[in-house]
Amino acid sequence: GGLELTDEIRLTIAAQACLLLLHRKTDYYPQLASILVYPSSYTAHEKRHLGANIWEEGDEHRLGHTGRRLGSLVLAWDDARRGAANPSDGRNLVLHEFAHQLDFEDYATDGAPALATKAEYQSWARVMSREFAALRSAAETGIPTVLDIYGAENPAEFFAVVTEAFFERPRALRAKHPELYAEFARFFRQDPIQYSAEPGRRTLNKR
């Protein structure tokens, strides 16, 4: 009763994963060894450290997961397919999980991927910390935001959520969070506004 991996599944996942690597001088997700695809959401046993000697343990439903230690990535196919079918809703499971892979490239799950210079790290930290705090505040007060409030969980989830918005809702992200958009455009070395399916007027570079 397992899921047969068809060309549609392989190509849908690969095409979206490759989008994050365009124009970047990088290896092809060097930490990733395997991708497991479920037909739909699945249940996993989770144990979380809450601080001090406090742990939380139980089962949770998941759509996807990235495991650095095992070099693995898990996706629910029905959600991955929905994300590909609607490229402008700001939610994309494949982009989200592969963004975690980029975050892991420097062996730290902190929302700061490997950057080229000290100045880039400083600029990244300044903008990301401010924007992360703003999203947490929005999540607590119920203020509408371009970003999925799941990104308020921690810096790693914030990076993955902003990646989704950067590629799927670039116009809205740049309008509401221009410095954040600029940091991601610098990191990914592309401007998704040039090809986005997001509704709105296209802006072409004039040179």
Task: Give the ranges of each region predicted by the language model.
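Metalloprotease/metallohydrolase-associated module, dominated by Zn2+-dependent proteases
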Residues: 10, 14-23, 40-88, 105-207
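Conserved, charge-rich beta-strand/loop surface module that forms ligand/interface-binding patches
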Residues: 25-29
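Short alpha-helix carrying the canonical HExxH Zn2+-binding catalytic motif
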Residues: 86-103
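Active-site loop/lid in soluble adenylation, ligation, and acyl-transfer enzymes
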Residues: 1-16, 30
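Extended, charge-biased low-complexity segments
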Residues: 33-35
